[in-house]
């Protein structure tokens, strides 16, 4: 199995220009930090969704929805896994990361891409088993996945939450990052010719600093967010062999960023700045980036609105979607609300990270319309004996959320969410004000479930792919007619 490392690169005039541009942009951003509180909020729905109705072939959970009780580990029931209207197609490896992407190339090969380093450098402890880097997996025969390559250029070595793919252009990209931030080495690969063997087009410092990412619909503007460094860098990808920074600006403690379908709005999951009580206090920021999108000289985004919700935890990512003619975000909070406590200890009263749906049809006036809350997230359950379940009290895991995915942006109908200790959860979102849970899949390790990766849909096969930190890559088929017609 080949690995793809970075060829020897000298500091050419182009590279020196990129470094200089990045330093200037970073200086401008740090000089314009915005220390403000979110401007508006609305009350959050507090009730849990009804349990999914599990059909034939399911292995349902044994109690509270979303929970794997300690008793199930002791009895061996947890080792059998839990499923509801899903069927395991295949699995691979024993380590997963934070994002999964899917691509079908011009020859009809189907590939999966996912990072295996977990939170770099933790992956080094698995060296020789999973190691580090980004896995390339041939999924043309989904029952028999084959890992064909490992990408080891700087960004792909540790992409953290930034791995992203543009299907029409056939480009796979990432910026180097970790749980805080790292120098923003930015890697671009061409996967269009043979997705099993990506071709490196460029590896440059264009990202300035890295952690998460976003991409315009036309695939010509990449956004690198840096989280704790308070910067977002827009990169021109018109020539993927020579990416060029356009602007760097202060976007709050920016986590995941996504764009509107025309590329003129930027939705930012903002962790917020520390307050007297909490380590994070953020929500959602919406920017007008039309000037950036149009490549106007000295383009800068314009902040349109900031928004939060009553039970904010750690804002992770806003996924845009359009349902019945209105614009929404499938917004995810990760982990749990972190009190300003040096131990970041478990507190049942703190909000659990979940997904929610926010109406952004008026980008200056966003409002939450529903929450994808499970029984396991309710405070009365968080305060009970479930906190003794393996992994449940982890400040960077437990019964909380991390990422969601949709099969398409216009009328997606369903969503798949990585709910960490609760595994993969499937929701019907055709009515954004009344979402329903319709399925799940969870095969936890002895230390607890750790489904962290943004899932991806294989619409041709009615499958969802995701990874678990401790149990590897999974391909799961939706069963019992929960796959919507016409999708």
Where on the chain are the PLM-derived regions?
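Secretory targeting and sorting signals
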Residues: 3-39
